[in-house]
Design a protein with these regions (language model features):
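Flavin-dependent oxidoreductase catalytic cores
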Residues: 1-266
Length: 266
């Protein structure tokens, strides 16, 4: 990036540090099937995804399958972005692997239905990206990963999963057990802490809980992860318990205090 752009980020980091604060920068390899299909009009290019998935906004519009070569380039770019963030004095990087964006599309069998190539292994893209970032930033630089424990599409739609054309291919999403296994491997690859949510674009209301849902509605989700790591004795790369961040209507100090004291999250 241009020197002027880098200096802007460095100035922002120093301003935050002046108040005793720390901040992470969120990195994403892209939107994939949930990106607006303006690329077709503006660049005469089809949108892309892990497999031949339908575009979220225009289901009749197919997304082209990214080649292994292009995915490897994306991983290298993520490593460079993380190295740039460290050079700008930003305190850590935060990978967005939730809500059905491209990182989730590559690491969830609902969207990644590849049969050939190294990224037919649905865990590999995410693990390779974390390893590349860790290689570029060194051992003492935090990597945070935002993930959903489940897409919860089958729970949301039930029998409609077989009836709605735009949902049919997404029935075999990552199970909770598979997600926990993936998270274990992410820790081994270099992730230091997690932000755990639930849902995706195709059940948009769920990861953005409406007024009718109670405060702290997803604390059981973060507790599942906390208990799993504790039971298996999984420690972060810093040798401490893996911190787990909770989400879901936590704008209430009393609810947050109980959650922290009760061990639901960190």
């Amino acid at each position: 990036p241009a020197r002027s752009l880098m200096s802007g980020w460095r100035d922002l980091a120093q301003q935050c540090h002046g108040y005793g604060s720390r901040f992470f920068i969120q990195l994403t390899p892209g939107l994939g099937r949930v990106g607006p299909p303006t690329c077709l009009v503006q660049q005469t290019k089809f949108p892309v995804s892990a497999s031949f998935n339908r575009n979220f906004y225009i289901p009749e519009l197919p997304c082209l399958r990214l080649s292994d070569r292009k995915l490897t380039r994306i991983i290298k770019n993520a490593g460079q972005a993380a190295a740039d963030a460290k050079a700008c004095l930003i305190d850590g990087v935060y990978l967005h692997g939730h809500e059905g964006y491209l990182l989730e599309q590559m690491t969830n069998r609902a969207f990644n239905r590849r049969k050939l190539g190294k990224y037919a292994d649905w865990q590999r893209f995410g693990l390779d990206m974390v390893r590349e970032i860790r290689r570029r930033v060194g051992h003492n630089y935090p990597i945070m990963y935002r993930i959903d424990l489940s897409l919860a599409l089958n729970e949301t739609y039930g029998g409609r999963m077989d009836q709605v054309a735009s949902l049919k291919k997404f029935k075999n999403g990552r199970s909770v057990a598979e997600t926990l296994d993936y998270m274990e491997n992410l820790v081994k690859a270099g992730v230091d802490l997690f932000d755990v949510d639930i849902g995706c674009y195709d059940n948009w209301w769920l990861p953005h809980p409406p007024a009718g849902m109670p405060a702290g509605c997803f604390l059981p989700v973060s507790r599942i992860v906390k208990e799993h790591f504790a039971q298996k004795g999984i420690r972060s790369n810093a040798g401490v318990e893996v911190p787990v961040v909770a989400v879901g209507k936590l704008g209430y100090p009393d609810v947050c205090e109980r959650a922290l004291r009760g061990g639901d999250c960190d």
